[in-house]
């Protein structure tokens, strides 16, 4: 049984993950001091690393493609990004760069969809759930 918070995080998330490191006792992300960012912008602090979004989408698609082949699945598979995960336009647009469709969760999302369509980021072929 793990008794400290550090041990819990270590066993649950395999921390530190790629990109994170300790530098002179301070947590960094790709060489950037997180303490510096927290002191500058305050907390709570949310960090979004756009290249990771594409990596995770590719990983999920790969898992599904392997399962589809292994099970001789004849249906179609479409990866859908759930907008409630993050409504920030730069995050949704990054996801759309990886040939995804969108899952909406509220009436607020309809405005997002309209803006994305006006910007040419989605079209009539984009599946909206």
PLM region descriptions:
Residues 1-129:
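A charged N-terminal "starter" segment
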């Amino acid at each position: 049984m793990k008794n400290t918070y550090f041990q819990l995080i270590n066993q649950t998330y395999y921390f530190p993950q790629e990109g994170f490191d300790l530098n002179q006792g301070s947590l960094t992300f790709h060489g950037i001091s997180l303490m510096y960012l927290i002191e500058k912008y305050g907390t709570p602090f949310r960090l979004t690393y756009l290249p990771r979004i594409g990596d995770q989408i590719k990983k999920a698609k790969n898992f599904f493609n392997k399962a589809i082949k292994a099970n001789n699945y004849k249906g179609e598979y479409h990866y859908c990004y759930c907008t409630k995960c993050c409504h920030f336009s730069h995050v949704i647009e990054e996801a759309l760069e990886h040939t995804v469709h969108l899952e909406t969760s509220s009436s607020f999302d309809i405005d997002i969809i309209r803006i994305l369509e006006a910007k040419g980021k989605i079209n009539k072929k984009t599946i909206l759930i």
